[in-house]
Regions:
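Bacterial Sec-dependent N-terminal signal peptides
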Residues: 1-16, 29
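Flexible, low-complexity junctional segments that flank or bridge functional domains
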Residues: 14-263
Protein backbone atom coordinates (compact mmCIF):
# COMPACT_ATOMS: atom_id res chain seq x y z
CA UNK A 1 0.00 0.00 0.00
CA UNK A 2 1.46 3.35 -1.06
CA UNK A 3 -0.27 6.55 -0.01
CA UNK A 4 2.38 9.26 -0.44
CA UNK A 5 2.13 12.46 1.58
CA UNK A 6 4.27 15.06 -0.16
CA UNK A 7 5.42 18.20 1.65
CA UNK A 8 3.86 20.72 -0.71
CA UNK A 9 0.41 19.22 -0.20
CA UNK A 10 -0.16 21.58 2.73
CA UNK A 11 -0.74 24.35 0.22
CA UNK A 12 -4.19 25.50 -0.85
CA UNK A 13 -5.72 23.31 -3.55
CA UNK A 14 -5.71 26.21 -6.04
CA UNK A 15 -2.44 27.90 -5.06
CA UNK A 16 0.03 27.91 -8.00
CA UNK A 17 3.01 25.66 -7.34
CA UNK A 18 6.51 25.53 -8.80
CA UNK A 19 6.73 23.19 -11.77
CA UNK A 20 10.16 21.86 -10.78
CA UNK A 21 8.80 21.02 -7.33
CA UNK A 22 5.82 19.17 -8.81
CA UNK A 23 8.09 17.23 -11.18
CA UNK A 24 10.46 16.37 -8.33
CA UNK A 25 7.62 15.09 -6.16
CA UNK A 26 6.29 12.98 -9.01
CA UNK A 27 9.75 11.58 -9.77
CA UNK A 28 10.03 10.55 -6.11
CA UNK A 29 6.63 8.86 -6.33
CA UNK A 30 7.67 6.90 -9.44
CA UNK A 31 10.88 5.78 -7.71
CA UNK A 32 8.98 4.56 -4.64
CA UNK A 33 6.33 2.93 -6.81
CA UNK A 34 8.91 0.93 -8.76
CA UNK A 35 10.68 -0.09 -5.54
CA UNK A 36 7.69 -1.07 -3.40
CA UNK A 37 4.73 -2.02 -5.58
CA UNK A 38 4.40 -5.77 -6.27
CA UNK A 39 3.53 -5.17 -9.94
CA UNK A 40 4.02 -1.57 -11.10
CA UNK A 41 4.38 -2.34 -14.80
CA UNK A 42 1.65 -4.71 -16.04
CA UNK A 43 -1.16 -2.15 -15.96
CA UNK A 44 0.87 0.12 -18.25
CA UNK A 45 1.63 -2.66 -20.73
CA UNK A 46 5.17 -3.30 -19.48
CA UNK A 47 8.17 -1.60 -17.90
CA UNK A 48 9.05 0.45 -20.99
CA UNK A 49 5.56 1.95 -21.23
CA UNK A 50 5.47 2.63 -17.48
CA UNK A 51 8.58 4.78 -17.68
CA UNK A 52 7.47 6.34 -20.95
CA UNK A 53 4.22 7.59 -19.39
CA UNK A 54 6.08 8.68 -16.26
CA UNK A 55 8.59 10.63 -18.39
CA UNK A 56 5.86 12.47 -20.30
CA UNK A 57 3.90 13.34 -17.16
CA UNK A 58 7.01 14.56 -15.33
CA UNK A 59 7.84 16.89 -18.23
CA UNK A 60 4.24 18.10 -18.38
CA UNK A 61 4.26 18.89 -14.66
CA UNK A 62 7.55 20.76 -15.00
CA UNK A 63 6.56 23.02 -17.90
CA UNK A 64 2.85 23.57 -17.16
CA UNK A 65 1.89 25.76 -14.18
CA UNK A 66 -0.15 23.65 -11.79
CA UNK A 67 -1.92 23.56 -8.47
CA UNK A 68 -2.31 20.92 -5.83
CA UNK A 69 -5.64 19.97 -7.39
CA UNK A 70 -4.26 19.61 -10.94
CA UNK A 71 -1.31 17.60 -9.59
CA UNK A 72 -3.71 15.30 -7.78
CA UNK A 73 -5.88 14.88 -10.88
CA UNK A 74 -3.01 14.11 -13.26
CA UNK A 75 -1.16 11.75 -10.94
CA UNK A 76 -4.39 9.95 -10.04
CA UNK A 77 -4.99 9.27 -13.73
CA UNK A 78 -1.44 7.92 -13.99
CA UNK A 79 -1.95 5.67 -10.94
CA UNK A 80 -5.30 4.42 -12.23
CA UNK A 81 -3.36 2.33 -14.77
CA UNK A 82 -2.20 0.12 -11.89
CA UNK A 83 -5.79 -1.02 -11.31
CA UNK A 84 -4.87 -1.18 -7.64
CA UNK A 85 -7.26 0.28 -5.09
CA UNK A 86 -4.51 0.39 -2.44
CA UNK A 87 -2.22 2.78 -4.32
CA UNK A 88 -3.46 6.33 -4.57
CA UNK A 89 -2.97 9.93 -3.53
CA UNK A 90 -5.07 11.47 -0.79
CA UNK A 91 -7.23 14.27 -2.25
CA UNK A 92 -7.13 17.88 -1.09
CA UNK A 93 -8.99 18.39 2.17
CA UNK A 94 -12.26 20.30 2.31
CA UNK A 95 -10.51 23.26 3.96
CA UNK A 96 -8.15 23.47 0.99
CA UNK A 97 -11.07 23.51 -1.46
CA UNK A 98 -12.76 26.72 -0.36
CA UNK A 99 -14.88 27.10 -3.49
CA UNK A 100 -15.90 23.47 -3.80
CA UNK A 101 -19.63 22.81 -4.23
CA UNK A 102 -21.57 19.68 -3.43
CA UNK A 103 -24.79 17.78 -3.96
CA UNK A 104 -27.14 17.19 -1.04
CA UNK A 105 -26.88 13.48 -1.77
CA UNK A 106 -25.61 10.23 -0.30
CA UNK A 107 -25.45 7.03 -2.31
CA UNK A 108 -24.43 3.49 -1.46
CA UNK A 109 -23.40 0.37 -3.31
CA UNK A 110 -25.62 -2.69 -3.57
CA UNK A 111 -24.86 -5.79 -5.65
CA UNK A 112 -24.55 -4.55 -9.24
CA UNK A 113 -25.89 -1.10 -8.57
CA UNK A 114 -26.11 2.14 -6.60
CA UNK A 115 -29.09 3.35 -4.58
CA UNK A 116 -30.07 6.63 -2.94
CA UNK A 117 -29.09 6.47 0.72
CA UNK A 118 -29.68 10.11 1.72
CA UNK A 119 -31.56 12.89 -0.10
CA UNK A 120 -33.37 16.14 0.76
CA UNK A 121 -36.61 15.53 2.64
CA UNK A 122 -38.57 16.94 -0.31
CA UNK A 123 -37.72 13.79 -2.27
CA UNK A 124 -37.95 11.24 0.56
CA UNK A 125 -40.32 9.06 -1.49
CA UNK A 126 -37.31 8.28 -3.74
CA UNK A 127 -35.14 6.82 -0.96
CA UNK A 128 -33.77 3.42 -1.88
CA UNK A 129 -34.23 4.01 -5.62
CA UNK A 130 -31.63 2.50 -7.94
CA UNK A 131 -29.70 4.89 -10.18
CA UNK A 132 -29.96 3.84 -13.84
CA UNK A 133 -28.35 6.82 -15.60
CA UNK A 134 -26.37 9.88 -14.51
CA UNK A 135 -26.74 12.98 -16.70
CA UNK A 136 -28.07 10.69 -19.40
CA UNK A 137 -25.13 8.27 -19.38
CA UNK A 138 -25.42 4.65 -18.30
CA UNK A 139 -23.92 3.56 -15.01
CA UNK A 140 -21.49 1.34 -16.94
CA UNK A 141 -20.14 4.35 -18.86
CA UNK A 142 -19.77 6.41 -15.70
CA UNK A 143 -18.01 3.56 -13.88
CA UNK A 144 -15.54 3.21 -16.76
CA UNK A 145 -14.74 6.94 -16.57
CA UNK A 146 -14.36 6.68 -12.80
CA UNK A 147 -11.80 3.88 -13.23
CA UNK A 148 -9.83 6.08 -15.64
CA UNK A 149 -9.36 8.85 -13.07
CA UNK A 150 -9.29 6.98 -9.76
CA UNK A 151 -7.39 3.80 -8.94
CA UNK A 152 -9.67 0.77 -8.73
CA UNK A 153 -8.77 -2.89 -8.93
CA UNK A 154 -12.23 -4.36 -9.48
CA UNK A 155 -15.85 -3.47 -10.12
CA UNK A 156 -16.63 -3.01 -6.43
CA UNK A 157 -13.79 -0.47 -6.16
CA UNK A 158 -15.30 1.48 -9.04
CA UNK A 159 -18.67 1.55 -7.31
CA UNK A 160 -17.05 2.59 -4.01
CA UNK A 161 -15.06 5.42 -5.63
CA UNK A 162 -18.12 6.68 -7.48
CA UNK A 163 -20.28 6.63 -4.34
CA UNK A 164 -17.64 8.42 -2.28
CA UNK A 165 -16.85 11.15 -4.82
CA UNK A 166 -20.15 11.68 -6.63
CA UNK A 167 -21.44 14.47 -4.34
CA UNK A 168 -18.42 16.72 -5.14
CA UNK A 169 -18.43 19.21 -8.00
CA UNK A 170 -14.80 18.73 -9.01
CA UNK A 171 -15.23 14.98 -9.51
CA UNK A 172 -18.50 15.45 -11.39
CA UNK A 173 -16.88 17.90 -13.81
CA UNK A 174 -14.16 15.35 -14.50
CA UNK A 175 -16.86 12.87 -15.47
CA UNK A 176 -19.08 15.40 -17.26
CA UNK A 177 -16.99 18.31 -18.65
CA UNK A 178 -20.12 19.97 -20.12
CA UNK A 179 -22.08 19.73 -16.88
CA UNK A 180 -24.13 22.77 -15.81
CA UNK A 181 -24.92 23.61 -12.18
CA UNK A 182 -27.00 20.54 -11.44
CA UNK A 183 -26.97 16.77 -11.83
CA UNK A 184 -29.82 14.68 -13.24
CA UNK A 185 -30.40 11.10 -12.13
CA UNK A 186 -32.70 8.57 -13.77
CA UNK A 187 -34.06 6.22 -11.13
CA UNK A 188 -35.91 2.96 -10.69
CA UNK A 189 -37.92 3.13 -7.47
CA UNK A 190 -38.27 0.14 -5.10
CA UNK A 191 -41.77 -0.45 -6.50
CA UNK A 192 -40.48 -0.56 -10.09
CA UNK A 193 -41.41 2.93 -11.32
CA UNK A 194 -39.14 5.11 -13.47
CA UNK A 195 -38.51 8.55 -11.96
CA UNK A 196 -36.12 11.44 -12.41
CA UNK A 197 -34.30 13.60 -9.88
CA UNK A 198 -32.36 16.81 -10.54
CA UNK A 199 -30.19 18.19 -7.74
CA UNK A 200 -28.36 21.55 -7.76
CA UNK A 201 -24.77 22.13 -6.71
CA UNK A 202 -24.66 23.88 -3.33
CA UNK A 203 -22.09 25.42 -1.04
CA UNK A 204 -20.96 23.34 1.93
CA UNK A 205 -23.06 25.52 4.25
CA UNK A 206 -26.15 25.13 2.05
CA UNK A 207 -25.77 21.36 2.12
CA UNK A 208 -25.41 21.39 5.90
CA UNK A 209 -28.60 23.47 6.15
CA UNK A 210 -30.60 21.13 3.90
CA UNK A 211 -32.98 18.83 5.85
CA UNK A 212 -32.09 15.29 4.79
CA UNK A 213 -33.88 11.95 4.92
CA UNK A 214 -31.82 8.74 5.19
CA UNK A 215 -32.33 5.04 4.80
CA UNK A 216 -31.63 2.88 7.80
CA UNK A 217 -28.03 1.71 7.84
CA UNK A 218 -25.44 0.34 10.21
CA UNK A 219 -25.68 2.86 13.05
CA UNK A 220 -22.17 2.62 14.44
CA UNK A 221 -19.12 0.45 14.49
CA UNK A 222 -18.95 -1.89 17.44
CA UNK A 223 -16.09 -3.40 19.39
CA UNK A 224 -17.97 -6.67 19.73
CA UNK A 225 -16.47 -9.75 18.12
CA UNK A 226 -19.72 -10.46 16.29
CA UNK A 227 -22.77 -8.21 15.92
CA UNK A 228 -25.74 -7.86 13.60
CA UNK A 229 -28.42 -5.30 12.86
CA UNK A 230 -31.51 -5.20 10.65
CA UNK A 231 -31.56 -2.26 8.25
CA UNK A 232 -35.15 -2.46 7.02
CA UNK A 233 -38.42 -2.18 8.91
CA UNK A 234 -39.57 -5.65 7.83
CA UNK A 235 -36.37 -7.21 9.18
CA UNK A 236 -35.57 -8.94 5.92
CA UNK A 237 -32.12 -7.39 5.37
CA UNK A 238 -29.35 -7.76 7.92
CA UNK A 239 -25.85 -6.35 8.24
CA UNK A 240 -23.36 -8.55 10.07
CA UNK A 241 -20.21 -7.04 11.56
CA UNK A 242 -17.31 -9.43 12.25
CA UNK A 243 -14.29 -7.73 13.78
CA UNK A 244 -11.89 -10.64 13.41
CA UNK A 245 -11.80 -14.34 12.68
CA UNK A 246 -9.85 -16.63 14.98
CA UNK A 247 -8.75 -20.18 14.19
CA UNK A 248 -10.84 -22.90 15.85
CA UNK A 249 -7.66 -24.53 17.16
CA UNK A 250 -6.92 -21.49 19.33
CA UNK A 251 -10.24 -21.74 21.15
CA UNK A 252 -10.01 -25.52 21.53
CA UNK A 253 -6.53 -25.23 23.04
CA UNK A 254 -7.59 -22.53 25.51
CA UNK A 255 -10.68 -24.53 26.43
CA UNK A 256 -8.57 -27.61 27.16
CA UNK A 257 -6.38 -25.47 29.40
CA UNK A 258 -9.43 -24.54 31.44
CA UNK A 259 -9.42 -20.88 30.44
CA UNK A 260 -12.73 -19.03 30.71
CA UNK A 261 -14.30 -16.04 28.95
CA UNK A 262 -13.26 -17.29 25.53
CA UNK A 263 -16.19 -15.74 23.65
Amino acid sequence: SLRPCLAYLLASAQEPLNGDSLASDFRYLVKELAATHPDPYSGFGGKVFFYEQAFHLENELRRTPGTKQTFFDKVSIFLSNLQDGHTYLLPPTANQQANQRYLALEVRTIPDGIILQGIPETYKDLLGSRITTINGDSLEEVLARTAAIQASENLYDRYANLCRSMPTEHFLRQLFPEMKDNLHLSLLTPDGKSRGLTLPLLSRQEVQNTPMQHNNSWKAYTDKQLAYQFIDNDKQIMLININSIMARDNFEYMQKQGLKDLY
